[in-house]
Amino acid sequence: MEVNLGKLAFDIDFHPSDHLISAGLINGDLLLYRYSADSLPQRLLEVHAHTESCRAVRFINNGRAIVTGSPDCSILATDVETGSAIARLEDAHGDAVNRIINLTESTIASGDDGGCIKVWDTRQRSCCNTFQAHEDYISDMTLASDSMKLVGTSGDGTLSVCNLRRNKIQAQSEYSEDELLSVVIMKNGRKVVCGSQSGTLLLYSWGHFNDCSDRFIDLSPNCVDALLKLDEDRIITGSENGLISLVGILPNRIIQPIAEHSEYPVERLDVVAASIISIMSRLSFIKFMQIWDLDDLLQDSGRTLKRQTAVEDSDGDGMDLDINTPKSNKGTKRQSASKGLGLNSSNDFFADL
């Protein structure tokens, strides 16, 4: 299924419970579609959300509102039913807002082009944490929900771990050779996987973030802009060459290609109900959002993975297994950032949510 968005798109997000998908466009517009398996998606809303591009899009409050971020440094909350603005924070960040993710039912995190990460509490209606975690743009973030630690990646080539309970940067990796573009937590919290500009997947062991414990180079030289976790052993990767692949983690292997998004980069991935995946490309002459039903394909891939694992177990070579002892934490690390900033302009941002 392919949808002509009319303009270059930067981000997408599925509704948590309804058949809705939102998209943020280069002209600052926010689009909302209803989709189904037997008909073309229907556009429900078109809102001019920002004066500059709409880089980040997320459903919040159980899907009742959509939060968007922009290079104009603002964050906007829009009502899903009416399309009306609920609240706008004009100076949410000092630099362009590049990424927004959900943390809990009442908190979200936003990252900007200056390396700053902020956590917003919709219940307390304020910014509750601020971390100057990086020196370049925030490319991606994910939450370890059991420990309430926020993992972030950046164009400066480092990975950070922010402790939300203690309000400090707990760990930071050494500089890698190229930009880190995407991140997921795998293996029941024991591994962190990062996609990089060179196409190498960097695997970090939890608690040993100084340097990666393993590298997977089979996707090189095409940068991995998007990572999507399917389960604790498999991820979907979106690469610069437009290829979407199913990849196994420890043992590391490309299980199979899933789809090809023409010859243009895949820069965002999202999934809903473990069977529908939406892929969006971000080039000036690509204005399409594609949706696939991968239910049968993923079931076949699971059987393929089990067969491959059984064969390798019989070989007993263990070449792909991460059995090396993690390196000791050494080297320079940047100091923890200042604690939650009391931004007066943000105190009532979520007042109407």
Language-model-derived ranges and their functions:
Residues G24-N27, G69-D72, S110-G114, T122, ...:
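Conserved strand-to-loop turn within each blade of WD40 beta-propeller repeats
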Residues M1-N4, Q42-A49, A85-A92, G111, ...:
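Short C-terminal beta-strands that terminate individual repeats in beta-propeller domains
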Residues E2-G28:
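Beta-strand-rich domains and repeat architectures in extracellular enzymes and scaffolds
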Residues G6-F14, T51-F59, G94-L103, D136-L143, ...:
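Canonical WD40 repeat/beta-propeller blade segments in eukaryotic WD-repeat proteins
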Residues L30-Y35, I75-D79, I117-D121, L159-N163, ...:
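WD40-repeat beta-propellers
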Residues D18-S22, G63-V67, L76, A85-A87, ...:
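Structural hallmark of WD40 beta-propellers
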Residues F10, E179, C212-D225, D231-D233, ...:
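Terminal intrinsically disordered, low-complexity extensions flanking WD-repeat/beta-propeller proteins
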Residues A23-Q42:
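Beta-propeller domains
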